[in-house]
UniProtKB/Swiss-Prot annotation:
Residues 16-116, 158-198 are annotated as: Disordered. Residues 95-105 have a biased composition (Polar residues). One of its GO terms (cellular component) is nucleus. One of its GO terms (biological process) is segmentation. Residues 35-46, 68-83 have a biased composition (Low complexity). Residues 179-198 have a biased composition (Basic and acidic residues). GO terms for molecular function: DNA binding; zinc ion binding. It comes from Drosophila cyrtoloma (Fruit fly). This is Protein hunchback. Gap class segmentation protein that controls development of head structures. It is found in: Nucleus. The keyword Thylakoid does not apply.
Amino acid sequence: WYSGMFAPNIKQEPISHHHHHHHAHHSHHQHPHDSNSNSNASSPHQSPLPSPNPPSNTILQLEQYLKQQQQQQQQQQQQQQQQPMDTLCAAAMTPSPSNNDQNSPLMPPGLPNPMQSIMPANLRPCPTATTTTTPAAAAPTTTAATIVLQANDKLQALTPPMDVTPPKSPAKSQQSCAEPEKEHDLMSNSSEDMKYMA
């Protein structure tokens, strides 16, 4: 039995093994103490067993945490996919500043930025509007404005973050309002815009 008791001791550090060895010699006659030292030897041998358990628990928690994160990322990706789709839809509907529409959602923090990038797009048709007959030039802009209204409606229905497009449409209407001939058409439209916005 001595070697049997020796084996668990070896698994401990050599110092404690030495210590136990000494004890075992001492307590050769005392059986209860011997069994006690045996339990002592086995209890450190068991203590590593519970210790792998908490790690496995933490691993499980980590897995759950990772899964949650993955789900969150998937949700974010879905939202990101939805937004460009809608803005692309609006871009396809509004003929002139389509490039700007596509670029602006990529940097939502710079909301004033898209408006700046849209201004030149709106100023560009203005010279052509003055050279050509104004009614013809006014017609496309008004249709574009009404299309923007429809796009706004869709955006409101589809995505909660509707603040991406609304700042643009008033910017468009105000921008083209700079031209007096168009003022009539666009004033009515911009007021409708405001109704939609409110």
